[in-house]
Amino acid sequence: MPKETGEKLIVQNKKARHDYAIEDKYEAGLALTGTEVKSLREGRASLSEAFISIDRRGEMWLEGANIPEYLNGTWNNHAPKRKRKLLLHRLQITKLARGIEAKGYTIVPLSLYFKDGRVKAEIALARGKKEFDKRQALREEQDKREALRAMRYANMRH
């Protein structure tokens, strides 16, 4: 079988982009079992309740991510919501650890994707948005959409 190349998106965490202001993005590998990878190849995953923690040993973990059991799996299947280790360089982990010490900052998973046949997680150092920030972002998005619609309508009339 030929080796995979390129990127293929599995799942995005749209709620994280809405609830947090993204500061820095990182790409992290994931330590997974075989049935987890097979389930991800079918596009079955959810990051809606996922969060990232750093333990005392300086290891990063993806927790709360739901990767359902592989349908054709046997007794060797995985637990859907188990902790999964994130693979990053030591310097990146220490930089992120220093970042979350600041008030209001956290690390959130943004997406899972395949890159050259390996599962990667896009994670970000993020600051929580206040309610008015969320409304402001929605308003700006809506204004942009209306402006595009008006320009399209004006172009059609000529």
UniProtKB/Swiss-Prot annotation:
User: Which PROSITE patterns does this one have?
Assistant: SSRP (PS01317)
- Record keywords, A-Z: Cytoplasm, RNA-binding
Matching entries from Gene3D superfamilies are given as: 2.40.280.10
Q: Which GO terms describe its molecular function?
A: RNA binding
Which Gene Ontology cellular-component terms appear in the entry? Answer: cytosol
Spell out the subcellular localization from the entry.
Answer: Cytoplasm
One GO BP annotation of this record = trans-translation
Q: Which family does it belong to?
A: Belongs to the SmpB family.
Q: What does this protein do?
A: Required for rescue of stalled ribosomes mediated by trans-translation. Binds to transfer-messenger RNA (tmRNA), required for stable association of tmRNA with ribosomes. tmRNA and SmpB together mimic tRNA shape, replacing the anticodon stem-loop with SmpB. tmRNA is encoded by the ssrA gene; the 2 termini fold to resemble tRNA(Ala) and it encodes a 'tag peptide', a short internal open reading frame. During trans-translation Ala-aminoacylated tmRNA acts like a tRNA, entering the A-site of stalled ribosomes, displacing the stalled mRNA.
Question: What is the protein name for this chain?
Answer: SsrA-binding protein
Q: State the species of origin.
A: Bifidobacterium longum (strain NCC 2705)
